[in-house]
């Protein structure tokens, strides 16, 4: 009995620590990008997955202590996919006292009609879903639309665009919607997926499967996701360093003429961002930038990232 109580206390301690970290990550993202302002009405897009449940829970938590007032309304889109459990979200939200709206639109039927059997339906489905959510935001008087993409999603998108699209483009933490009428925010932008997975399991969220439509997953994104997970396992801190790099862009040391006026450089021009360090041996920090070992990560040793010495 004592052993059970001891385990329960430890689990609660770990959950509190995890929630505190997620809350800190979300709070920092909100502050850094001015995501939420006084009087905002936030439409929280709730799919029934681990990410959107976590986003709603952390925003509700922050709402109680934030120095500004803002309201939340959870919105779920019932796309009439076969087997969709309509009762789950109302049963979860009503006891919490969360305002919510279930929007019923048969996008599943439209997608099945337009996309050949066996092909990935995600692109068309997401466009239809986006339009419906924008319309719903207007109907509800929402000033912001919150999506549940996290740090790993942002990095995956960056590498997808670099590997397959030939451009350095990630997923913005805050943007103007396609119709030019709504501000979209991603409060989980600084949150690690593995933290969200652990939090969702500990909170026992009633997860709704994401593949009810039967669509095949995006294989390219899966390749990137597997690659990043492998890097994170073999080189602790590499993911944090790459995300930190997205926040420390040096246009003068890339090759985009739209970001930096290379043609304007003449004799006598000032040195920009250190000039040319390509021929100097740079000091590589033992601990990757942006990474701090956690209290419960005692099994991880600080590893130097692979460095190729150019002779």
Curated annotation (Swiss-Prot):
Record field: transmembrane: none
Key words, A-Z: 4Fe-4S, ATP-binding, Cytoplasm, Iron, Iron-sulfur, Magnesium, Metal-binding, Nucleotide-binding, RNA-binding, Transferase, tRNA processing, tRNA-binding
Principal location: cytoplasm
UniProt remark on cofactor binding: Binds 1 [4Fe-4S] cluster per subunit. The cluster is chelated by three Cys residues, the fourth Fe has a free coordination site that may bind a sulfur atom transferred from the persulfide of IscS.
Motif PP-loop motif per record, residues: 47-52
Quaternary organization: Homodimer.
Other facts: The thiolation reaction likely consists of two steps: a first activation step by ATP to form an adenylated intermediate of the target base of tRNA, and a second nucleophilic substitution step of the sulfur (S) atom supplied by the hydrosulfide attached to the Fe-S cluster.
Name of this chain's protein: tRNA-cytidine(32) 2-sulfurtransferase
Species of provenance: Salmonella paratyphi C (strain RKS4594)
């Amino acid at each position: 009995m004592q052993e059970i109580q001891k385990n329960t206390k430890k689990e609660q301690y770990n959950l509190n620590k995890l929630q505190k970290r997620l809350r800190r990550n979300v709070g920092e993202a909100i502050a850094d990008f001015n995501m939420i302002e006084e009087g905002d009405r936030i439409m929280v897009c709730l799919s029934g997955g681990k990410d959107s449940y976590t986003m709603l829970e952390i925003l509700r938590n922050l709402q109680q202590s934030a120095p500004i007032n803002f309201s939340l309304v959870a919105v779920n889109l019932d796309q009439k996919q076969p087997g969709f459990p309509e009762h789950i979200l109302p049963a979860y939200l009503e006891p919490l006292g969360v305002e919510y709206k279930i929007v019923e639109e048969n996008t599943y039927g439209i997608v099945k009609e337009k996309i050949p059997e066996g092909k990935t339906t995600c692109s068309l489905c997401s466009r239809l879903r986006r339009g419906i959510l924008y319309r719903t935001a207007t109907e509800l008087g929402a000033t912001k639309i919150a999506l549940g993409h996290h740090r790993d999603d942002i990095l995956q998108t960056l590498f997808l665009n670099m590997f397959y699209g030939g451009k350095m483009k990630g997923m913005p933490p805050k943007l103007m919607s396609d119709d030019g009428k709504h501000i979209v925010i991603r409060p989980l932008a600084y949150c690690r997926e593995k933290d969200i997975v652990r939090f969702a399991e500990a909170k026992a969220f009633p997860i709704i499967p994401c593949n009810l439509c039967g669509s095949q997953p995006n294989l390219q994104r899966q390749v990137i996701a597997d690659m990043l997970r492998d890097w994170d396992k073999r080189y602790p801190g590499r993911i944090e360093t790459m995300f930190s790099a997205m926040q420390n862009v040096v246009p003068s040391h890339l090759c985009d003429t739209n970001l930096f006026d290379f043609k304007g450089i003449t004799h006598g021009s000032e040195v920009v961002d250190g000039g040319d360090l390509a021929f100097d041996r740079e000091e590589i920090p033992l601990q990757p930038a942006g990474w701090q070992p956690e209290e419960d990560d005692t099994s991880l040793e600080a590893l130097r990232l692979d460095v190729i010495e150019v002779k």
